[in-house]
Structure formats: C-alpha cells, structure tokens
C-alpha cells in the first residue's frame, strides 16, 4: 500500500523546489524591506556614497555621489563647504550645485574639475557644512548636522 501511494503521489512528495523558491523569495523581500526601513531611518533624505576635493594650482576641484532615499525627486542639490588649513584657519567657503532629476533610490554623481574658488597653498581640509535639496515640487530641505550622512 505504501509503495502504491508513493508511486501515485511521487511528484508532489519529491518536488519541493517551488516551496523553497517561495520561502526564499519571501525571506529576501523581508530582509530587503527591513534594510530599506533602517536606511530611511538613518538617512531619510539621502546620503553621500563618495566625495572628494583637490586644490591643484590653488583652484578647487570637487566631486560627489549622492543617493536619494526620499520619495520626492530632487531637482537641485546644493552642497556647501568650508576649506581650512591644518590649524583651523578658514581659507574659503562656497557651494556647488548639482542638477537632477534624482528619483528615490537613484544615485548620481557630479564633478567640477575646475571652479572659480581659489585657496592659498596651505589649504588642507574641506568639510561639507550644509546641503540644500530642492525638490521638483519646489519644496526645499536643509540638511546639517546628523542629517548629513556619509557612507
């Protein structure tokens, strides 16, 4: 009797791949959903995945990569900076503006090989002090302090 039962229901008894696929899919979705929730809690307006600067020939060059984690599409991203020397003397302040659009969970990069910002030879440190996000709907969000998130 068992052999007969096995022969008739053999396919359903041995074919477990669909169940494993479903379980794997549900687990993947669950972990992805949890990751996105943690990411949005830590960086609700986005974060820098990379940035850097140089002052070759006293002219500031700058680049950054930003990922938008907000549902609103970014139209402009203004990155404000200050440059100091090794003892903290202020050498230059300014900002660079990147143009979108940058949709939710998209990242983009901007690069300025040259700029109209010049610094003295002892300029050695740059800090991003503020970011202003202008969204497609015209609203703005100012990011300072712990809202400035770097990967």
Please describe what each predicted stretch is:
Residues 90-151:
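Short, solvent-exposed, Trp/other aromatic-anchored flexible loops in extracytoplasmic proteins
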Residues 24-61, 150:
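Low-complexity, acidic Ser/Thr/Pro/Gly-rich terminal tails and inter-domain linkers that flank the onset
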Residues 71-88:
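Short acidic, flexible loop segments centered on an aromatic residue
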Residues 10-13, 48-50, 123-130:
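A structural signal for short, hydrophobic beta-strand segments that form beta-sheets
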Residues 1-23:
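Amphipathic, non-membrane alpha-helical rod segments
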Residues 65-71:
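Asparagine-centered strand-capping/turn motif at beta-strand->loop junctions
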